[in-house]
A protein has these predicted regions:
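Re-entrant/interfacial helical elements at transmembrane boundaries that shape
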Residues: 39-48, 62, 77-97, 128, ...
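Helix-loop-helix hairpins and the membrane-proximal interhelical loops
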Residues: 1-58, 138, 189-294, 379, ...
Length: 496
């Protein structure tokens, strides 16, 4: 293996490789930062360009776009509470709070640092333990997917702020919204009201933009917050070594969580981000800071979602199974280049594969370098008065929502959920649990029903499979431990 890695490293050392990594990363960051323009869109749009390229150059450019877009979503999530991608929704919780406090520069730097750490750890795991992780990933069936989704849903209690009941209500509403469209098992229309646009369900991007961006803009207009002071001025302070050190363990843990989840086909960066965020809050010594401007919260979210980038290649390269939409496109790109993903790929195209895997480490290094430079430009956004920014943000939101399906209906969905988000926020109901339930709802429902069909209606199937049982135990602990911790704190406060 070591000789293959060294050969891949030598093969990577080409000006052409680095130029296209640089260009791909720049394009990816721009796509990620613009609401509605996802990594999938970037990779799909530029894939035809790579057909005439050297396989290493073409695939590395597409991977650069993937990593860049995953990181880029955090920029607008932090600066204007408009996650560029669903994977950055958890980042907006603490990132925007820090921006309002005047620490947006620190938030952006933490997001960049955590994204780089997550991406590099994921790339290293791809390089060294891909076959082992692929074996674990293929053992996931419907019961395991249900248990994983259930574990993800328990995070609702962590992201509900001070009122868990309101968070659970929003989670229930999100689950209901996720049921709109054709039944995933029987194909029967549900909650469509005979409207043809609802048959396919609601797209995540318009819902995300509405709940976060539009609702926030309505709030600003209502309060007439049009001054620069509405988004507090960035202080010139930088992220300190002690702050990086304090969040480094969180980054490592979240990167591993993201890598494990990313290796499981059909999951994705959004799920990894929320699970990493919930776990970081659960073990934190200061959980009360989460939601009001915690650097640990940003570190967990960004390390988690970027930990997915390399991990999704594990089932793709070793088994020929794409982990998400981006790797499904990469599957086509590899096949057009004459490489058929699967167990024999390492024997037939070992040199090319190891060059790509080593190159993924350099992709993340380029992300850090380019991100460092771009942060200086992005912070200037907060200097622009909000009465100029609001029309620009609305235009970007409309463009992003429309771009999903080239349908005006998605723009209407965005506006509707903007109003929903504003009304619920007005009465103290957090919208993040609703978004999490919309993301995880389809996986939870479909996998649960498939499991019950397999077991002829017996719930024993969830308790007789080791991985499934482990996630169920984690779900119970995720709910029970915070309650026990709160009770202990209450008893201590009473004795004091």
């Amino acid at each position: 293996m070591f000789s293959n890695i060294m050969a891949g490293f030598v093969n990577l050392l080409s000006i052409q490789n680095f130029v296209f990594i640089f260009l791909g990363m720049m394009i990816g960051i721009i796509f990620g930062a613009l609401p509605g323009l996802t990594a999938t869109m970037a990779v799909a749009l530029f894939t035809p360009i790579t057909f005439g390229m050297n396989p290493v150059v073409g695939i590395l450019m597409l991977l650069s776009m993937y990593c860049g877009a995953t990181y880029g979503g955090s920029i607008t999530a932090i600066l204007i509470k408009t996650p560029g991608t669903p994977a950055s929704a958890a980042t907006a919780i603490d990132g925007y709070a820090l921006t309002q406090q005047g620490h947006g520069g620190k938030a952006l730097e933490m997001a960049l640092f955590a994204s780089t750490v997550g991406g590099i750890i994921s790339a290293l795991m791809l390089l060294f333990i891909a076959p082992v992780m692929a074996k674990v990933a293929t053992s996931f069936g419907p019961p395991e997917f249900f248990a994983l989704a259930l574990f993800g849903l328990t995070i609702i209690s962590s992201i509900s702020g001070n009122n868990i009941i309101k968070g659970l209500i929003m989670g229930a509403i999100g689950m209901l919204v996720s049921c709109i469209g054709l039944d995933r098992i029987t194909g029967v229309p549900r909650l469509t009201f005979n409207h043809r646009y609802l048959v396919g369900g609601l797209q995540l991007i318009p819902v995300l933009i509405g709940l976060f961006a539009i609702s926030e803009l309505v709030r600003k207009v209502e309060k007439k917050d049009f001054n620069v002071s509405d988004v507090a001025e960035f202080s010139k302070e930088k992220l300190t070594g002690s702050e990086i050190k304090g969040s480094f363990l969180t980054m490592i843990k979240s990167s591993i969580i993201g890598t494990v989840i990313g290796a499981i086909p059909g999951t994705g960066a959004a799920i990894a981000s929320f699970i990493s965020y919930g776990e970081a809050k659960r073990v934190s010594k200061t959980p009360e800071k989460f939601g009001s401007g915690s650097l640990d919260g940003i570190a967990a979210s960004e390390a988690g979602n970027n930990g997915v980038t390399g991990a999704t290649l594990i089932p793709l390269l070793t088994l020929g199974i794409p982990g998400d939409a981006v790797t499904a496109i990469l599957l086509g790109s590899l096949m057009i280049q004459g490489m058929i993903p699967g167990p024999s790929l390492f024997q037939t195209h070992g040199k090319v594969l190891y060059t790509i895997m080593v190159g993924l480490i350099f992709v993340n290094i380029f992300m850090f370098i380019e991100g460092k430079f771009l942060i200086k430009l992005f912070v200037k956004i907060t200097k622009v008065p909000m009465n100029f920014m609001i029309p620009v943000i609305i235009l970007l939101c409309i463009t992003g929502a429309y771009a999903v399906n080239n349908a005006y209906f998605d723009v209407l969905v965005m506006l509707a959920f903007g109003l929903v988000g504003y009304v619920f926020s007005r009465f103290g109901f957090p919208v993040t649990p609703m978004l999490l339930a919309i993301i995880l709802g389809p996986t939870a429902e479909e996998s649960m029903r498939q499991s019950l069909i397999i077991s002829n209606g017996s719930i024993k199937i969830f308790f007789t499979r080791p991985i499934c049982l482990a996630f169920i135990i984690l779900s119970v602990l995720s709910i029970a431990l915070p309650i026990i911790k709160n009770n202990k704190n209450l008893k201590r406060s009473k004795t004091v």
